[in-house]
């Protein structure tokens, strides 16, 4: 067990966390910032990448890595951070030191809503709206802001997220059988499996992964967590969740639509 306190910088998620963004790149958790360098793609051995090694080495040796600024800021304000919450997660067998023990999957951006709190990397419908109206201004989609000088950069980004949403014939990473082979080969080590999106209930691969985990027997040692907008009812997916070690449904507020 890796014990985290306010007096150290250790983090279990730097060792056992695997959060895969909608674009297929990996990081230890959903809170971390990109920082310098390139995050490893799911197809790489993430734990051997320089990006991940430097993060792990810093946190293990008392250095507050700037990529973890969200946790540092929360802790400075006296608020429980995800890092500190790792102690409880370990006690409840929801994460351990194995690199695939805590898995957070965003299998693309397919969604059935366009909530105002969301952006194109996480909602295929927003991505389509932007792609269909690229001559409009879309503030906040680029760090520099949406100005004419950056229009070409914006168009490139809009096209990328339009493709990610599945609106073209181009094969996306979450459709690659090799990814699911890798996930299944590590299933015995998974203790938490979390799905966000997009909207997980409209993503076919989410249903397929959960069904496989149940049929293979791995669901018995996995805590399942899903973040949903709650618009889809009477799904086999909800019944499948009952076969996992524990289940948690996080409902997003629709007042922000």
What feature does the model see in each segment?
Residues 1-89:
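Accessory C-terminal segments flanking Radical SAM cores
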Residues 15, 29-31, 82-83, 115-119, ...:
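A short acidic (Asp/Glu
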Residues 15-23, 95-121, 191-194:
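N-terminal pre-triad scaffold of radical SAM enzymes
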Residues 27-33, 106-173:
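Canonical Radical SAM [4Fe-4S] cluster-binding loop centered on the CxxxCxxC motif
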Residues 77-102, 111-113, 134:
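Recognition helices and adjacent regulatory flanks at domain boundaries
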Residues 108, 125-136, 144, 163-181, ...:
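Canonical radical SAM enzyme core domain
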Residues 192-194, 223-225, 248-252:
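Structural preference for beta-strand elements that scaffold enzyme active sites
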Residues 255-257:
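Conserved small/polar residues in nucleotide/adenosyl-binding loops
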């Amino acid at each position: 067990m890796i014990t985290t306190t306010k007096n150290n910088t250790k983090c279990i998620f730097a060792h056992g966390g695997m959060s895969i963004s909608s674009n297929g790149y990996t990081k230890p958790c959903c809170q971390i910032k990109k920082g310098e360098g390139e995050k490893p793609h799911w197809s790489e051995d993430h734990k051997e990448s320089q990006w991940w090694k430097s993060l792990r080495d810093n946190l293990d040796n008392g250095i507050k890595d700037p990529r973890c600024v969200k946790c540092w800021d929360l802790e400075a304000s006296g608020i429980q951070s995800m890092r500190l919450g790792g102690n409880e997660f370990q006690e409840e067998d929801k994460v351990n030191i194995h690199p695939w023990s805590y898995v957070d999957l965003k299998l693309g951006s397919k969604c059935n809503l366009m909530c105002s709190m969301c952006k194109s990397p996480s909602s295929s419908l927003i991505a389509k709206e932007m792609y269909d109206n690229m001559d409009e201004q879309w503030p906040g989609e680029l760090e520099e802001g949406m100005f004419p000088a950056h229009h070409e950069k914006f168009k490139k980004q809009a096209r990328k997220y339009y493709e990610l949403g599945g609106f073209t014939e181009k094969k996306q990473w979450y459709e690659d059988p090799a990814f699911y082979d890798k996930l299944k080969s590590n299933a015995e080590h998974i203790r938490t499996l979390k799905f966000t999106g997009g909207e997980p209930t409209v993503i076919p691969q989410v249903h397929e992964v959960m069904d496989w985990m149940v049929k293979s027997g791995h669901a018995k040692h996995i805590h399942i967590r899903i973040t949903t907008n709650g618009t889809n009812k009477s799904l086999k997916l909800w019944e499948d969740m009952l076969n996992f070690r524990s289940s948690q449904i996080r409902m997003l507020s629709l007042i922000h639509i």
